[in-house]
Amino acid sequence: MAETRTATSLSAEQKTELLRLCLETIQVYCRECRILPYNTEDPSLLRPAAVFVTLRIRSFLRGCVGQVSPDYPLYRAVQNAAVSAGFADPRFPGIREDEIPQLQVKIAVLSPLEPIHADQIVIGKHGLLITQGSQRGLLLPEVASDNHWDLNTYLE
């Protein structure tokens, strides 16, 4: 099962291609510890994007990593996040080859970060970037809705 959630408009074909690329990247990296080159002329996949990849197995989180700044073309950001979520999330051991068929993949393409007042936050639409000193963490929009949080719980 796979899903691409975007803040920008991507066609169904582009979303499918990103999910395919994400899974292929995980498979190849698991076997060969490398990221395959990817060639595309699709302008939507070449534009810089901030991306998070979430991996689950049987609904249990198995990895979630990405970046909030659009430093790479979308396709490469997906590849980087796929490898990081699958093999570098410090909360979990790396994905094993026998786990790959069970992976549920979500790709979140983030919109540019903007300040927002707390009373303007819409659960399921807005994520939160929380910073304290040099540390920061991101709550994707689905975190609050998946956990049935109200606004106060989300902000606590």
Where are these regions (language model features)?
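Basic nucleic-acid-binding interfaces
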Residues: 1-156
